[in-house]
């Protein structure tokens, strides 16, 4: 089962490692400067790569078919998910309600109008400043 879950990246990396081992530790500079003929695959490697790619494509096709079947089963009107999120606005409203609830239950900070600390009375400050100018 695990063999069927190879990703294309893993297959390519295995082939690259195989090619690197077949070169028997040739310095990187000589690999980069070498002719493109060294990068060709043998007939057996080509068949192996084609078989791996074909198996991978079949596996992905089966997974897509299974997902489509599950979506078809899940899209029935009896499904609780379709009842719960039958209308996009209902789902969005639920999401916004949850976010708003998180905002209100978030711990308060000591910044803002209702922050603890010295409270100033603007009217008293204006009277004090006004009286000091007139010398009362």
Swiss-Prot record:
Residues 116-130 have a biased composition (Basic and acidic residues). Residues 1-25 form the signal peptide. Residues 63-84, 114-136 are annotated as: Disordered. The modification Phosphoserine is found at residue 42. Disulfide bonds join 85-91. GO terms for cellular component: axon; cytoplasm; extracellular region; extracellular space; neuron projection; terminal bouton. Glycans are attached at residue 87. GO terms for biological process: adenylate cyclase-activating G protein-coupled receptor signaling pathway; artery vasodilation involved in baroreceptor response to increased systemic arterial blood pressure; cellular response to nerve growth factor stimulus; detection of temperature stimulus involved in sensory perception of pain; feeding behavior; inflammatory response; intracellular calcium ion homeostasis; negative regulation of blood pressure. The keyword Chloroplast does not apply. It is found in: Secreted. The keyword Phosphoprotein applies. Keywords: Amidation, Cleavage on pair of basic residues, Disulfide bond, Glycoprotein, Hormone, Phosphoprotein, Secreted, Signal. One of its GO terms (molecular function) is signaling receptor binding. The modification Proline amide is found at residue 116. Residues 26-82, 121-136 form a propeptide. It holds the Pfam family Calc_CGRP_IAPP. Calcitonin is a peptide hormone that causes a rapid but short-lived drop in the level of calcium and phosphate in blood by promoting the incorporation of those ions in the bones. Calcitonin function is mediated by the calcitonin receptor/CALCR and the CALCR-RAMP2 (AMYR2) receptor complex. Belongs to the calcitonin family. This is Calcitonin. The gene is Calca.
């Amino acid at each position: 089962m695990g063999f069927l879950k190879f990703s294309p990246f893993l297959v390519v990396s295995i082939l690259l490692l195989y090619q690197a081992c077949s070169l028997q530790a040739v310095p990187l500079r000589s690999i980069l400067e070498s002719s493109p003929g060294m990068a060709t695959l043998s007939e057996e490697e080509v068949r192996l790569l084609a078989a791996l790619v074909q198996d991978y494509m079949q596996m992905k096709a089966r997974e897509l078919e299974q997902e489509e079947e599950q979506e078809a089963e899940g899209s029935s009107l009896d499904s609780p998910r379709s009842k719960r999120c039958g209308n996009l606005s209902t789902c969005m409203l639920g999401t916004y309600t949850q976010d708003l609830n998180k905002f209100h239950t978030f711990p308060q900070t000591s910044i803002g109008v209702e922050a603890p600390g010295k409270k100033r009375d603007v009217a008293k400050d204006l009277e004090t400043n006004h009286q000091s100018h007139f010398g009362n």
